Amino acid sequence: MAVSFSVDQKLDCKGLKCPLPVLKTKQALDKMTVGQVLEMISTDPGSKPDMAAFSKRTGHELLQVKEEGDTYIFYIKKTK
């Protein structure tokens, strides 16, 4: 089953190390409205567990995670 959603904003965090991808994701989501989807791109392997923990802690929905080589792409839906 394919996941279907549209991206409202993109955030490029390539080259940034923990905790910057999470902090920049939080800042971007703070400016978005409920229901919008953020695409965050990171090259930090630590961002995979960090984003899962961030989603669980904040309640924002982690819709999908893609790995393309050394790049991680996260789709996060603002829920509140």
Model regions and ranges:
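Helix-centric, low-specificity signal for extended rod-like, repetitive segments
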Residues: 10, 17-19, 49-50, 72
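Amphipathic, hydrophobic secondary-structure cores in small proteins
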Residues: 19-61
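C-terminal structural segments of small proteins and small subunits
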Residues: 52-80
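Short secondary-structure boundary/capping segments
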Residues: 2-3, 30, 64-66
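Short amphipathic
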Residues: 7-14, 41
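Compositionally biased, disordered extreme N-termini, encompassing classical targeting presequences
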Residues: 1-8, 79-80
